[in-house]
Curated annotation (Swiss-Prot):
Disulfide bonds: none annotated. InterPro entries: AceGlu_kinase-like_sf (IPR036393), AcgluKinase_fam (IPR004662), ArgB (IPR037528), Asp/Glu/Uridylate_kinase (IPR001048), Glu/AcGlu_kinase (IPR001057), NAGK-C (IPR041727). Its main location: cytoplasm. It is found in: Cytoplasm. It comes from the Bacteria. The keyword ATP-binding applies. Substrate binds at residues 71-72, 93, 193. This is Acetylglutamate kinase. It catalyses: N-acetyl-L-glutamate + ATP = N-acetyl-L-glutamyl 5-phosphate + ADP.
Length: 304
């Protein structure tokens, strides 16, 4: 009997932490959240395991997580192993037919499989698919303009259409969809590599998601990089649009994705530091958000 009060006392802080999450649990219950998995979190074993725990936690907390992933580091390593030299133009990987075979193999056969495996350590939850499956992502050949001229960068696609049917069926069945950023073209039947940040944003908008969350290797969007490491914690779509021309090239597709999402019905888009374990939970279930949140212009002050 003498241990009773002590036990009660030591358990109280845990109860307090759980109760603090209640307003967020209420707010996000039943809502869809699209999470773009990328950066250092993809190659660090502890971060990968923590990411899987976070996604499963969201699922069991009543949210509907959808994971979208790329595989930059793994693709580069596999291309090196196959003796295929990676070339970049306008920040986009030039994807030859040979390279596309490797990209597809790595994304659908390695990165996706590993992620599905990590999630399924917690139960029969995750199902992997690519944008090719059930016409989830349709694309056309992307030809960027450099110095006024269209440049051929091979099998790189621009998203033209999203079909959410397969993902919605999986969510309705209580599963966690894990989507590889590969798409097929209806024009030429070819398979294309699409930017995973762009794919995540397009899926978030098409699904009517509450939140788009993009994991990065930085703390968020910096106020005045490189002169300052002050992170902008919140900004509107219009404010972000003004900043886009000044951003480092690696951040452009991420922030353009956030802009597209909030301008197409997504309540908030967040760029968070994927190097911090459980950063997803910190961002969703506390008021101490650790990244940059983008909100629609008309809802400034209302979005949370």
């Amino acid at each position: 009997m003498s241990h009773g009060p002590t036990r009660k006392h030591t358990a109280l802080p845990k109860a307090q932490i759980l109760i603090e999450a209640l307003p967020w649990l209420t707010r996000h219950n039943g809502k869809t959240v699209v999470v773009k998995f990328g950066g250092n979190a993809m190659i660090d074993e502890e971060l990968k395991a923590a990411f899987a725990q976070d996604i499963v936690f969201l699922h069991h907390a009543g949210l509907k997580p959808v994971v979208v992933h790329g595989g930059g580091p793994q693709i580069s390593a596999a291309l090196d192993r196959h003796g295929i030299v990676s070339e970049f133009k306008a920040g986009l990987r030039v994807t030859t037919e040979d390279a596309m075979d490797v990209v597809r193999m790595v994304l659908a056969g390695q990165v996706q499989r590993e992620l599905v495996g990590l999630l399924n350590q917690h139960g029969p939850l995750a199902v992997g698919l690519t944008g090719e499956d059930a016409h989830t992502i349709t694309a056309t050949k992307h030809q960027p303009e450099i110095d006024g001229e269209l440049v051929d960068i091979g099998r790189v696609g621009e998203i033209t259409e999203i079909d959410t049917g397969a993902i919605e069926a999986l969510l309705a069945d209580g599963r966690i969809p894990v989507v590889s950023s590969i798409a097929r073209s209806q024009d030429d039947g070819h398979v294309y590599n699409v930017n995973a940040d762009t794919a995540a944003a397009a899926l978030a908008a098409a699904l009517g998601a509450e939140t788009l969350m993009v994991l990065t290797d930085v703390e968020g969007l910096y106020e005045d990089w490189p002169d300052s490491d002050e992170v902008i914690s919140r900004l509107t779509a219009s404010e972000l649009e003004k900043l886009l021309p000044e951003l480092a090239s690696g951040m452009v597709p991420k922030m353009e994705g956030c802009l597209h999402a909030v301008r197409n019905g997504v309540t908030t888009a967040r760029v968070i530091d994927g190097r911090v374990q459980h950063s997803i939970l910190l961002e969703i279930f506390t008021d101490e958000g650790i990244g940059t949140m983008v909100v629609p212009d008309e809802e400034e002050g209302d979005a949370v």
